């Protein structure tokens, strides 16, 4: 926006639990359109809505964009745990604590925390963390099976956005004074090659606190 020198009302973002293959197959799904001008958001949502695809609207552009990018780090961690053989309890812990981490970070950046509880947040997280169609989940799964980052990159179908995003989450956390234990642990996986067990050990290394 700053580069193009255009008002924020001219920009919109779309995000949600939208695995592209399932949308192409016309399976029922929904998304969220965010724009500072809610009328513009409604115009775009109307253009996107079909008998199998529903669009909702919000003014929270910051929250929606953060949900769409930061959840990929959580998907990497869940995929890694599943690839290493851990079950639903572990996956649910990572997803839930990851969502709490991202919500706190989003709120510190000026986002509406309710966005993280909606389609763009928890909805997208469920889809991304539970499907082999998700590049980030698949990439993480390959790491959990013992592949290196380089090997996982070679066998992955497309770019796993969570790989470069992990360090960005850690940096944002430092900027806003928000702890990011999950993103920090995944950053160590990607940069130092620590195992899934070590990654989980870092998460459990946190001091006892209220949920």
Label each residue range with its predicted role:
Residues 44, 48, 101-106, 169:
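Hydrophobic alpha-helical packing residues
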Residues 54-57, 87-91, 106-116:
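Short, structured loop/turn "capping" segments at alpha-beta junctions
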